[in-house]
A protein has these predicted regions:
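Structural motif
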Residues: 29, 80-81
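Generic hydrophobic/aromatic pocket-lining and core-packing "Φ" positions
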Residues: 23, 41, 74-75, 101
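Glycine-rich beta-strand-to-loop/alpha-helix junction loops that act as flexible
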Residues: 55-56, 87-90
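Conserved, mostly hydrophobic/aromatic
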Residues: 26, 44, 77, 88, ...
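C-terminal helical cap(s) of enzyme catalytic domains, especially alpha/beta-barrels
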Residues: 78, 91-115
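Conserved anion-binding
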Residues: 1-42, 46-54, 59-65
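Conserved beta-strand positions in the central sheet of alpha/beta enzyme cores
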Residues: 35, 85-86
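Short secondary-structure boundary/capping elements
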Residues: 66-70
Length: 115
């Protein structure tokens, strides 16, 4: 979603404020983890460190964004605090899904080894 789609359903606050309120409410109710759009990772990690965060909407830099308006590439999502990234179409619709997955995996492993 983007700000316009949020406003269209009658919510007049910013996406950032809405996400912050939802995260705080979830944490107050002892959730196991959060499912967040990639662009919302910064909000969550400022509120609480070491929480499990599932992130769908991953799109590599050279792939189509499809309907995702607030996506990030896999490495950026990991760097911003994603615990689990959920990647569908960029892998399943690629010409070589196995190669695509291996490239993503290698990129993330290399980053994690250094950090």
């Amino acid at each position: 979603h983007d700000q316009k789609s949020i406003n269209d359903i009658g919510i007049k606050q910013s996406i950032q404020n809405l996400i912050k309120k939802l995260i705080l409410n979830a944490l107050k109710n002892n959730v196991f983890g959060l499912i967040l759009a990639p662009k919302d990772l910064d909000i969550a990690t400022k509120i609480k460190k070491n929480i499990t965060i599932f992130v769908p909407g991953i799109r590599e830099k050279k792939t189509r964004k499809d309907e995702h308006k607030r996506s990030l590439d896999s490495l950026s999502a990991v760097k911003k605090g994603a615990t689990y990234i959920i990647i569908g179409r960029p892998i399943t619709k690629s010409k070589n899904p196995e190669r695509t997955l291996k490239l993503i995996n290698k990129k993330i492993k290399n980053y994690l080894k250094k950090n």
